Curated annotation (Swiss-Prot):
Gene name as annotated: gcvPB
Species this chain originates from: Coxiella burnetii (strain CbuK_Q154) (Coxiella burnetii (strain Q154))
Protein name from the UniProt record: Probable glycine dehydrogenase (decarboxylating) subunit 2
InterPro entries: GcvPB, GDC-P_C, GDC-P_N, GDC_P, PyrdxlP-dep_Trfase, PyrdxlP-dep_Trfase_major, PyrdxlP-dep_Trfase_small
Short name of one Pfam family: GcvP2_C
Coiled-coil boundaries: none
Positions where N6-(pyridoxal phosphate)lysine occurs in the chain: K264
Amino acid sequence: MLIFEKSRKNRRTLAHAIADKMDANDIPANLLRHDAPRLPELSELEVVRHFTRLSTQNFSIDTHFYPLGSCTMKYNPRAANRLASLPGYLKRHPLSPAPQSQAFLQCLYELQTMLTEITGMEKISLTSMAGAQGEFAGVAMIKAYHESRGDYDRTEMIVPDAAHGTNPASAAMCGFTVKEISTTKDGDIDLEKLRQMVGAKTAGIMLTNPSTLGVFERQISEVAKIIHNAGGLLYYDGANLNAILGKYRPGDMGFDVMHLNLHKTFATPHGGGGPGAGPVAAGPRLSKFLPVPMVGKNKEGYDWLTEKECPKSIGRLSAFMGNSGVLLRAYIYLRLLGKEGLSRVAEFSTLNANYLMKRLEQLGFTLAFPNRRASHEFIITLKPLTRAYGVTALDIAKRLLDYGFHAPTIYFPLLVPECLLIEPTETESKQTLDHFIEAMEKILTEIKTTPDLLRNAPHQQLINRLDEVKAARELDLRWYPIAKETEIFIQ
């Protein structure tokens, strides 16, 4: 129910003191309202109950196990929130001069240093405000590199069939023609097809390693050799960096540029449309094209590096320095863990994924890549169960809600039919994983005995199974009641 539908005429909350110097005459006439705003009329208690009730209906990492594949829904430590909200950071104006921002700039400089070491790259820019924007920046840098060499005919970007949807989108936005490369039955890039595909038009290839199939690209060195010998560059999508922290670096694999998803690997908040951060790191070929500003260090201290110091930069992607609050949270997360802690992140995220994968296989679920070890996530395909019982991946996802678990990613990657992409992350305990396994075992029994129970799930949520066709064709998304209902609050 919308809050407007609870409104009753003349119902009020507590009165608030009027500002001492408030005078409507001080406000320009064109900015004054001529009609009263359409606001609901409720008591303070009703408002508190309404929004508290809504908050309890959310699934989140703070309330439920959230094994959303390719999203790395790990716990965000509250210490990072507290420290990033210290007055010296929180109240700093974005245009404050560098001499008055030395502590802030030091944090960003040290974050740059740590991230370049983690990735094996030469330099990094922190200004991109989301992973997708960082990805766009990296592809734009590849384009700038080729154009600086007069290679205007390099117009093709190779993208695997298991790639994130943002990969071909970023390539297309930068003017490249996208060429799809297939993967083998074991999840590796098809090297023979890659050799046939590269040529004088090849600008580069975009890869995630481990891939979205949940397996490590075992022939990455050969892939890098093929692309570089053809005159192209390698772009690394940092979506799955969590699996290899402290173990293997993208720069050491041969990648030339990459972006990092701070909301995944480095425990900054997910969702809500932002704020986000997607730093871009580059090797020797591309570092001069990084977006500005960056933070530099000189004998006086720390300062901004802008277009003046970086004339080959692709330019600015954000106002000021990007989303500083998110960057500070990632910095604090890294300082809390240290090198050994980061290495344990990779170990436990991989351990949890493989434990969960093997247990589900033992129950009777079909693995998409049974001969491969999982990295940080894995895929089960429900195609045999769909054929036998008519139950789909969507049905299982809905039923998991009744057992108190957020559903894994479903129907992605697209090349695996009826799939669940499951990523438990390193912050989950064995007890939590065992509870999830128990739920999946019960669901498997339900599939074989009472499949209709799944087809109509969920049964214990505020909103049950929607008519998705009707919802898509007759979208009803609004913040206030319509027609007759509106009379409740505009009388």
